[in-house]
């Protein structure tokens, strides 16, 4: 099974880390789809719900390190939304473990790769998105 993971990345840090991982030829699963956001503070729970509805197996939200958000508190707002999304996904029977928030700087390509590998391993244990069977 090749799990599909949607990574919502802030332009300043998360996307920079993903880009650096790519230009450094670091290896991570090719089934990760990156959606660039101006800031993770722009992330909305409906983005995750739509991703799961369309067949994603997991969602990552990748923002700046705490205290280093270019928009001051955007990453903290996203963290709250992800926490709520976890509860909602549990209630819906999809599973809150299918979404997580990661914090890193643009220079931490290795941390991006580790986060992707962590989510991939998690999805392999959980199995495919239960909505795919419907």
From Swiss-Prot:
Annotated cofactor note: Binds 1 [2Fe-2S] cluster.
Catalytic class of the enzyme: oxidoreductase
A GO term for molecular function: metal ion binding
Cofactors that this protein relies on: [2Fe-2S] cluster
Keyword Iron: yes
Source organism, top-level taxon: Archaea
Subunit structure: The F420-non-reducing hydrogenase vhu is composed of four subunits; VhuA, VhuD, VhuG and VhuU.
Family as reported in the entry's similarity comment: Belongs to the MvhD/VhuD family.
Name of the protein this chain belongs to: F420-non-reducing hydrogenase vhu iron-sulfur subunit D
Upper lineage: Archaea, Methanobacteriati, Methanobacteriota, Methanomada group, Methanococci
